[in-house]
Curated annotation (Swiss-Prot):
NCBIfam families: hrcA. One of its GO terms (molecular function) is DNA binding. Belongs to the HrcA family. Coiled coil: none annotated. Pfam families: HrcA, HrcA_DNA-bdg. Keywords: Repressor, Stress response, Transcription, Transcription regulation. The lineage of its organism: Bacteria, Bacillati, Bacillota, Bacilli, Lactobacillales. Negative regulator of class I heat shock genes (grpE-dnaK-dnaJ and groELS operons). Prevents heat-shock induction of these operons. It comes from Latilactobacillus sakei. This is Heat-inducible transcription repressor HrcA. One of its GO terms (biological process) is negative regulation of DNA-templated transcription. InterPro entries: GAF-like_dom_sf (IPR029016), HrcA (IPR002571), HrcA_C (IPR021153), WH-like_DNA-bd_sf (IPR036388), WH_DNA-bd_sf (IPR036390), WHTH_HrcA_DNA-bd (IPR005104), WHTH_transcript_rep_HrcA_IDD (IPR023120).
Length: 352
């Protein structure tokens, strides 16, 4: 069992290594500890910490650095969120002070704001889609058998795609199909709309068009675009600033992790109904990708009441100042949730 002094030494080694990136020796610790401890005593305590695997020696220095086990122990037992300085608080609050026109705009911009504040890679996910409803659907003729399909949702999002209409579908049939959508699907949650496309809607469309498959494909494609979980990334290139890899192909692979939605969702371990009210930290050897062994991933959920929950994540070096980042993420999720709740309230007022 570690003594209070050994725990204090471990915390100081992590703090000093985080600040300087240099191995920490007994002389440096002697000048930084809040009580007088001899260099010999510190060396003995460091030897004990090394024996249990919490710190380790580097080849190029007589000092010690935290091990992955040491970081995990620190994160599980010793860390306290840092009290943010007023400038950090003001910067976050001012960043959300501008007017936004869409939910997506707020969530995507928040990734850029957080990345700029931290110099790390930031990832944000909008509130869950379960309560978002279909509020509008239109087909705008573009000529040459092309139409633009437009879907509007209760989240304030507008999604559109251009499609080529099969020759077998007439303009009159399209108008009737749009009427079916407006009569039977408007106002329903997107998840319910998706289900009805496979069950009730085909039979309804068969009353008005000989082959509804073409129209169903159009509507289904643009609905999927509106329904997909949106992950936004800020500061993609920051990820490469902390890599110890020199192989170009491996560096490209790291960069691709955050540019491929499936890889990113897997990294974040997104799963329905799972929510973290506290900031969670995963270290490199705890992640699914070996290329990230020198990185640390911090995630936390934010709550937007009846509109669901979203997620904020930070991906940076294992040696990032976790205490400050936890404090910053706690503040950031509060401000993001406030902004989204205000947006939803304004949107509801405008709809009534």
């Amino acid at each position: 069992m570690l003594t209070e002094r050994q725990l204090m030494i471990l915390k100081e080694i992590i703090r000093l290594f985080t600040e300087s990136g240099q191995p920490v020796g007994s002389k440096k610790l002697m000048s930084e500890l809040p009580m007088h401890v001899s260099s010999a005593t510190i060396r003995n305590d460091m030897a004990d910490l090394e024996n249990v695997g919490l710190i380790e020696k580097t080849h190029s220095s007589s000092g010690r650095v935290p091990s992955m086990k040491g970081y995990r122990y620190y994160l599980d037992h010793l860390i306290q969120p840092a009290v943010l300085n007023p400038m950090d608080v003001a910067t976050v609050q001012q960043s959300f002070g501008r007017h936004y026109h869409k939910i997506d705009e707020i969530v995507s911009q928040s990734a850029n704001i957080l990345s700029n504040l931290t110099s790390y890679t930031a990832i944000t996910l909008g509130p869950e889609m379960a309560e978002i409803r279909l509020t509008g659907f239109r087909l705008v003729p573009l000529g040459n058998h092309q139409v633009m399909a437009i879907i509007v949702t209760s989240a304030g999002t507008v999604d559109n795609q251009v499609f080529t209409i099969p020759n077998a579908i007439s303009g009159d049939e399209l108008e009737k199909a749009i009427r079916v959508v407006n009569d039977h699907l408007i106002g329903l949650p997107l998840t319910v709309v998706s289900q009805k496309l496979k069950t009730e809607v085909p039979a309804l469309l068969m009353q008005y068009m000989g082959s509804p498959g073409g129209f169903l494909n159009i509507f289904d494609d643009v609905l999927k675009q509106a329904s997909q979980e949106r992950l936004y990334v800020g500061g993609q290139s920051n990820l490469l600033n902390f890599s110890e890899l020199t192989d170009v192909s491996q560096l490209k692979s790291i960069y691709n992790i955050i540019n491929q939605s499936d890889d990113l969702a897997k990294l974040l371990e997104l799963s329905p109904g799972e929510a973290n009210s506290q900031v969670q930290v995963r270290l490199g050897d705890e992640m699914t990708n070996d290329l990230l062994k020198n990185y640390s991933l911090m995630t936390v959920n934010y709550d937007v009441g009846e509109h669901g929950q979203g997620l904020i994540a930070l991906l940076g070096p294992t040696s990032m100042p976790h205490s400050r980042m936890i404090g910053l993420l706690d503040l950031f999720r509060e401000e993001l949730a406030k902004k989204l709740i205000d947006y939803y309230a304004d949107f509801d007022d405008n709809q009534s």
